[in-house]
């Protein structure tokens, strides 16, 4: 067994190919929402929280539909970026791999929003979008100074 510490996370701008994948997932979710809820449009703001909750409540997405839940996570992340000053999309490289995350300012505080909803769906947990958004905002407000 090694006493070495895991490598520190490194943050970089999201590469173009990953941005394109994320855009594709956003577009697919937007089309699904438009087909289920005529006139509804994702705005990338906190106004999306109730719409995302409608998607959850509609039970349209299978718990195993990873791309759809990742798209939901992206939409949640987009809204959080507009609601929480200092949050931004970045790519993180750490002991768990390379993923797009939300990072708070220039700290180590990161939110793996792409899989946040997916994991809850897979585990059959209740998903309350507004509660999750409020909790994350409060966590950042009260705990961000603990992250360097």
Task: Give the residues covered by each predicted segment.
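N-terminal low-complexity, intrinsically disordered segments
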Residues: 2-66
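Short, well-ordered coil loops that connect the C-terminus of an alpha-helix to the N-terminus
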Residues: 39, 86-87, 131
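Short coil/turn segments at secondary-structure boundaries
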Residues: 44-47, 93, 132
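Short runs of predominantly hydrophobic/aromatic residues within well-ordered alpha helices
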Residues: 45-48, 68-77, 110, 114
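A recognition module on extended beta-rich or small alphabeta surfaces enriched in W/G with H and D/E
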Residues: 101-148
């Amino acid at each position: 067994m090694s006493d070495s510490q895991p490598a520190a996370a490194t943050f970089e701008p999201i590469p173009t190919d990953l941005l394109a994948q994320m855009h594709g997932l956003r577009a697919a979710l937007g089309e699904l929402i438009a087909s289920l809820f005529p006139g509804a449009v994702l705005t990338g703001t906190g106004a999306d929280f109730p719409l995302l909750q409608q998607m959850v409540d509609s039970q349209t997405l299978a718990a195993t539909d990873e791309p759809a839940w990742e798209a939901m996570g992206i939409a949640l992340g987009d809204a959080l970026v507009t609601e929480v000053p200092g949050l931004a999309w970045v790519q993180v490289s750490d002991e768990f791999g390379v993923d797009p995350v939300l990072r708070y300012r220039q700290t180590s505080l990161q939110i793996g929003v792409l899989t946040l909803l997916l994991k809850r769906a897979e585990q059959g947990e209740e998903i309350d979008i507004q509660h999750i958004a409020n909790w994350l905002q409060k966590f950042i407000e009260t705990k961000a100074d603990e992250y360097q």
